[in-house]
Amino acid sequence: MKLNLVGLGRNTPIYILEKFDFDEQEFFSSLKVKTTEVAVLKTCHRREIYYIGDKEPLTINEIIEPYIIRKSGIDVVRHLFKVSCGLDSMVLGEHQILSQVKNTHKNFCHGKILNKLFNEAVSLGKEARTKTGINKYPLSISYIAVKLIEEQINIEGKKIFVIGTGMMGQKVIKYLVSRGADIYISNRTIKKAYEIKKMFSEVNIVDFEEKYKHISSSDVVISATNAPHYVVEEKKVNSQKNIIFIDLSMPRNIEPSIKEYHTLYTLEDLNEISKKYNKLRQEKISTIQNLIETRIKKFLTWYKLQTVKDDILYIQNLAEKLVYEEIEKLSKKILLDDNSLKQIQKSLKSCTKKIVSYHINYIKEKVI
């Protein structure tokens, strides 16, 4: 029952992460047939496969091999717990990663041990945030994107065009509405755009095919879609003024060459602003680390007991079998009334239980 992790961490360059992009459900289904237990955690900044076994359930492309992280045993547990608590995020303590770990546990986790591990990770993530208040301030990537805009221009009254109405896009819109921006939104599925309109009446809906017309007249353009290709191409942007482009997508949705004529920020650029806000949360780290170490001990105790669970069950069943056999032999050799037989049976079971219990506790102590 060897616990392992293989994947790409948050420090992996975007162009490498793009080479290891996949549909979670299809990828998860393909791995399930290759190993007894597996879990897939995919976010904007990481691609991680947790599994039980000695052999990696996938072939690593030589291009991404230099960036691969591999962990085993307690290091896997500590890594996931740090991830769920937001200690391994671009934004220290950010809440979105906890939702992503929870999603993995619910939809992309297979096997008793990994289910237990991810359940503990989700529980710990909630405990860490509740006890320390590390997420008191909204420091998600979407929030940092808006703060980045505020450092460049006064948002109030400015035309800001948001492409994509998923979770990230919705958060951006929420922050922009509170700052009085003139917001335009577009989504390939127009129905979803109207759903956002119900949530934020201030927004204006743009047909996806008309997006370039509005891009050219915008002060800021934010892309937050799940498209596997460029949604904004440099040659189609017709504007003499400097437009601030922010690409919150993975893979990237805004053609990189656009920065030759305009201002472009990607997920990597947000790291600089995140450092400023991380200082507000640094004091909480030691408390969370203590919570992590306590939870690691709890999980490892459970994990180690699983290795001897079958042995313990065997001993208990064998003891019951031997007691039954001895009572059967005794009842045939000695004529006893029912009451006497019950008393002997009770005493024999009690004695056996104490002996078995002693040995089981000894085994547990040795393992733990």
Curated annotation (Swiss-Prot):
Active site, UniProt feature: C44
Example GO BP: protoporphyrinogen IX biosynthetic process from glutamate
Associated pathway: Porphyrin-containing compound metabolism; protoporphyrin-IX biosynthesis; 5-aminolevulinate from L-glutamyl-tRNA(Glu): step 1/2
UniProt keyword list: NADP, Oxidoreductase, Porphyrin biosynthesis
Record field: transmembrane: none
Cross-referenced PANTHER family: GLUTAMYL-TRNA REDUCTASE
Subunit architecture: Homodimer.
Function noted in UniProt: Catalyzes the NADPH-dependent reduction of glutamyl-tRNA(Glu) to glutamate 1-semialdehyde (GSA).
Domain notes: Possesses an unusual extended V-shaped dimeric structure with each monomer consisting of three distinct domains arranged along a curved 'spinal' alpha-helix. The N-terminal catalytic domain specifically recognizes the glutamate moiety of the substrate. The second domain is the NADPH-binding domain, and the third C-terminal domain is responsible for dimerization.
Protein name per UniProt: Glutamyl-tRNA reductase
Species, as recorded: Thermosipho melanesiensis (strain DSM 12029 / CIP 104789 / BI429)
